[in-house]
Amino acid sequence: MAISKESKAQYFEKLRSLFEKYNSLFVVNIDNVSSQQMHTVRKQLRGTAELIMGKNTMIRRAMRGIINDMPELERLLPVVRGNVGFVFTNADLKEVRETIIANVIAAPARPNAIAPLDVFVPAGNTGMEPGKTSFFQALGIPTKITRGTIEITSDVHLVSKDAKVGPSEATLLNMLNISPFTYGMDVLTIYDQGNVFSPEILDVSEEDLIGHLLSAASIITAISLGANYPTILSVMHSVVNAYKNLVAVSLATEYTFEGTEQTKAFLADPSAFVVAAAPAAAAGGEAEAPAAEAAAEEEEESDEDMGFGLFD
């Protein structure tokens, strides 16, 4: 059914108003998403975000009409492909993403559908009558008859990820009441204030960023020191290393400066160190004696108090 010019104009105006109102949006894949799921997501996002759908050609045409005023939107054009929609928001991106991807439902396998994951049939009794054994044999599934029913003897990898589901595989899964797939909105790309990035970026925590920053700082410092090229990160280490070298040279030669005078004196006359350390040790002993006397006095006072009764 053809869309009228009036409807297109209204859609273009609606999209423009959303781009002007919101700073961020999610590009979401809506393959196999039911209308009921769409309604539920819209309801959960109400007051926080707005979901808009449309044909890709209409979305691109509307965006090209806005690019003159908002040139940063040109970065979004390449990601408008496939069965996608936009979720506009100014709220916390992580919270909105969780709401978008939380609404999923289990779905049966359909013939010719692309499997989003590997599908396994578990070992166990199927409850089916022996007459259907040939059906399992055709799919290469090992079985045996147990108490008049078919039993699968080992787990079977029935469908590989990204492969088409065959009619026989779909029939078997339905016969076993296995709904192997879950369908819901999938976030493909995030647009935020002119920047386009992968949704995995939202999973990077503040601790991860700090860890990467510290690791980078350590690497830069090591390279700077190794290349003897001073940087803000390495200059303190360079100064300390240079001072250590200067002290080593001073101790090995007759050159003396303020930082090595005392060390050289102690090395020349170790007994001077013993003499210098003695007053400090004596001062420590004198400080301990008054403390011991004070403790003894407190103990005596406590003992005297113990001799009085409540009404003495």
Swiss-Prot record:
SUPFAM superfamilies: Ribosomal protein L10-like. The modification Phosphoserine is found at S302. GO terms for molecular function: large ribosomal subunit rRNA binding; structural constituent of ribosome. InterPro entries: Ribosomal_protein_uL10 (IPR050323), Ribosomal_uL10 (IPR001790), Ribosomal_uL10-like_insert (IPR040637), Ribosomal_uL10-like_insert_sf (IPR043164), Ribosomal_uL10-like_sf (IPR043141), uL10_eukaryotes (IPR030670). Residues 286-312 are annotated as: Disordered. Its main location: cytoplasm. Disulfide bonds: none annotated. Keywords: Cytoplasm, Phosphoprotein, Ribonucleoprotein, Ribosomal protein. Phosphorylated. Residues 295-306 have a biased composition (Acidic residues). It is found in: Cytoplasm. GO terms for cellular component: 90S preribosome; cytosol; cytosolic large ribosomal subunit. GO terms for biological process: cytoplasmic translation; cytoplasmic translational elongation; ribosome biogenesis. CDD domains: Ribosomal_P0_L10e. Component of the ribosome, a large ribonucleoprotein complex responsible for the synthesis of proteins in the cell. The small ribosomal subunit (SSU) binds messenger RNAs (mRNAs) and translates the encoded message by selecting cognate aminoacyl-transfer RNA (tRNA) molecules. The large subunit (LSU) contains the ribosomal catalytic site termed the peptidyl transferase center (PTC), which catalyzes the formation of peptide bonds, thereby polymerizing the amino acids delivered by tRNAs into a polypeptide chain. Belongs to the universal ribosomal protein uL10 family. Component of the large ribosomal subunit (LSU). Mature yeast ribosomes consist of a small (40S) and a large (60S) subunit. The 40S small subunit contains 1 molecule of ribosomal RNA (18S rRNA) and at least 33 different proteins. The large 60S subunit contains 3 rRNA molecules (25S, 5.8S and 5S rRNA) and at least 46 different proteins. The acidic ribosomal P-proteins form the stalk structure of the 60S subunit. They are organized as a pentameric complex in which uL10/P0 interacts with 2 heterodimers of P1 and P2 proteins. uL10 directly interacts with 28S rRNA. This is Large ribosomal subunit protein uL10.
